[in-house]
């Protein structure tokens, strides 16, 4: 987790007045959010509040109609494919459904992007993949196929794959929601270790205790807007709005 930043620090991610519509359905309604380097941010809220859409906008997977979104000082514009490619080298994303390639071994899944995108030598790519799999506790699974792994192991491979591009920011979209309860802890422990190592993390999560434990900042989204934002002890301990109090009442214990 990060230490306090000075007021003059330029945010690593700077979002201003972001609006996103699907036809007549406005999903993001003027979102403002600033995230500093090394900060761990958890985004919470009901289903349909815009959490995952916001993450996908940050990664350039979704375009937006109004507002500004800059990453590392560079404005994100959907009509500039080269800029989007550069963005995705620096912004990794882990999805709730793993999205591993079933026909590739675990090691090949982790090696694919550095080989194709960064065109690194194969011996370098392989050594890095082995190192990353060791980092997530799966060094012995290099040659295994995805269908030979548990859901928790597959998600840890997905984390290693996202880290293979050496991203500056890691986006986590409900990374435990598809897992059986007994597998959640192994994935959260890997994410927690990344937070402790200074990775900039932006997480959509329903794991309230985990968010309270690892976050520098918690964002509560409600009906497409940032409704409350603050340090976890403040936001969880003294929610300011009826909407957040109601949400925490049935989501946290």
Segment roles from a protein language model:
Residues 2-11:
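Extreme N-terminus of proteins, especially the signal/transit-peptide cleavage junction
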């Amino acid at each position: 987790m990060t230490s306090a930043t000075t007021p003059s620090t330029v945010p690593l991610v700077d979002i201003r007045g972001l609006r996103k519509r699907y036809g007549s359905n406005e999903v993001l309604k003027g979102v403002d959010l600033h995230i500093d380097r090394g900060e761990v941010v958890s985004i919470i809220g009901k289903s349909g509040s815009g959490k995952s859409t916001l993450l996908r906008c940050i990664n350039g997977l979704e375009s937006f109609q109004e507002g500004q979104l800059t990453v590392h000082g560079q404005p994100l514009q959907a009509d500039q494919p080269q800029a989007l490619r550069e963005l995705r080298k620096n912004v990794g994303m882990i999805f709730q459904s793993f999205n591993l390639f079933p026909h590739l071994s675990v090691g090949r899944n982790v090696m694919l992007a550095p080989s194709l995108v960064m065109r690194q030598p194969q011996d370098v790519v392989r050594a890095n993949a082995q190192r990353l799999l060791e980092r997530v506790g799966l060094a012995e699974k290099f040659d295994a196929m995805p269908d030979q792994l548990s859901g928790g192991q597959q998600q840890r491979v997905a984390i290693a794959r996202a880290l293979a591009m050496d991203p500056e920011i890691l986006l986590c979209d409900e990374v435990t929601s598809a897992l059986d309860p007994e597998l959640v802890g192994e994935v959260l422990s890997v994410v927690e270790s990344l937070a402790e190592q200074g990775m900039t993390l932006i997480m959509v999560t329903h794991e309230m205790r985990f968010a309270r434990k690892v976050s520098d900042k918690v964002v509560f989204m409600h009906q497409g807007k940032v409704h409350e934002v603050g340090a976890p002890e403040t936001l969880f301990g003294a929610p300011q709005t009826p909407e957040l109090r109601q949400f925490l009442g049935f989501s946290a214990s």
